[in-house]
């Protein structure tokens, strides 16, 4: 199939961008909702480990190996932003601000992670624009 779109929430949001970066003929559109868009950098591996542990005792190293494994960089949208720009992939990136709402309640880990994720989304937007990107919507 060609010309499809892929959208993901949280960890699947960064995966949606990665799928579009590496398979531009199949995915011409990609959407990311509240995803950490620089997972291999800084606190990324630790925060992913925290979230995965909180979600059921999973380990981040079971996903892409130890944090210095090349798989982390390969699956990092920030490091693949040039591919998205070169492919002219249409992207939509959304992220909340970490403030509690009726939907999310007052969940402290969620508020912390959403605030951290928002910072990564803003860095991704800056990198995308600096790379010459012009086919994105940011919310």
UniProtKB/Swiss-Prot annotation:
<feature type="binding site">
    <location>
        <position position="123"/>
    </location>
    <ligand>
        <name>substrate</name>
    </ligand>
</feature>
<dbReference type="GO" id="GO:0005737">
    <property type="term" value="C:cytoplasm"/>
</dbReference>
<dbReference type="InterPro" id="IPR029058">
    <property type="entry name" value="AB_hydrolase_fold"/>
</dbReference>
<keyword id="KW-0808">Transferase</keyword>
<comment type="similarity">
    <text>Belongs to the mycobacterial A85 antigen family.</text>
</comment>
<protein>
    <recommendedName>
        <fullName>Diacylglycerol acyltransferase/mycolyltransferase Ag85A</fullName>
        <ecNumber>2.3.1.122</ecNumber>
        <ecNumber>2.3.1.20</ecNumber>
    </recommendedName>
</protein>
<keyword id="KW-0012">Acyltransferase</keyword>
<keyword id="KW-0134">Cell wall</keyword>
<feature type="binding site">
    <location>
        <begin position="116"/>
        <end position="119"/>
    </location>
    <ligand>
        <name>substrate</name>
    </ligand>
</feature>
<feature type="active site">
    <location>
        <position position="114"/>
    </location>
</feature>
<keyword id="KW-0964">Secreted</keyword>
<feature type="active site" description="Nucleophile">
    <location>
        <position position="10"/>
    </location>
</feature>
<comment type="subunit">
    <text>Homodimer.</text>
</comment>
<dbReference type="GO" id="GO:0005576">
    <property type="term" value="C:extracellular region"/>
</dbReference>
<dbReference type="InterPro" id="IPR000801">
    <property type="entry name" value="Esterase-like"/>
</dbReference>
<feature type="binding site">
    <location>
        <position position="10"/>
    </location>
    <ligand>
        <name>substrate</name>
    </ligand>
</feature>
<keyword id="KW-0963">Cytoplasm</keyword>
<dbReference type="Pfam" id="PF00756">
    <property type="entry name" value="Esterase"/>
</dbReference>
<dbReference type="GO" id="GO:0050348">
    <property type="term" value="F:trehalose O-mycolyltransferase activity"/>
</dbReference>
<comment type="function">
    <text>The antigen 85 proteins (FbpA, FbpB, FbpC) are responsible for the high affinity of mycobacteria for fibronectin, a large adhesive glycoprotein, which facilitates the attachment of M.tuberculosis to murine alveolar macrophages (AMs). They also help to maintain the integrity of the cell wall by catalyzing the transfer of mycolic acids to cell wall arabinogalactan, and through the synthesis of alpha,alpha-trehalose dimycolate (TDM, cord factor).</text>
</comment>
<dbReference type="GO" id="GO:0004144">
    <property type="term" value="F:diacylglycerol O-acyltransferase activity"/>
</dbReference>
<feature type="binding site">
    <location>
        <position position="38"/>
    </location>
    <ligand>
        <name>substrate</name>
    </ligand>
</feature>
């Amino acid at each position: 199939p060609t010309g499809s779109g892929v959208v993901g929430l949280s960890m699947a949001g960064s995966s949606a961008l990665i799928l579009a970066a590496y398979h531009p003929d199949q995915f011409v559109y990609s959407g990311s909702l509240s995803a950490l868009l620089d997972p291999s950098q800084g606190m990324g591996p630790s925060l992913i480990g925290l979230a995965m542990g909180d979600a059921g005792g999973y380990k981040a190293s079971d996903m892409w190996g130890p944090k210095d494994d090349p798989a982390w960089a390969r699956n990092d949208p920030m490091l693949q932003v040039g591919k998205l720009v070169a492919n002219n992939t249409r992207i939509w990136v959304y992220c909340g601000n970490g403030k509690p709402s009726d939907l999310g309640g007052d969940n402290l880990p969620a508020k912390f992670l959403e605030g951290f994720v928002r910072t990564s989304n803003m860095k991704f937007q800056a990198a995308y624009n600096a790379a010459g990107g012009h086919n994105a919507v940011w919310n």
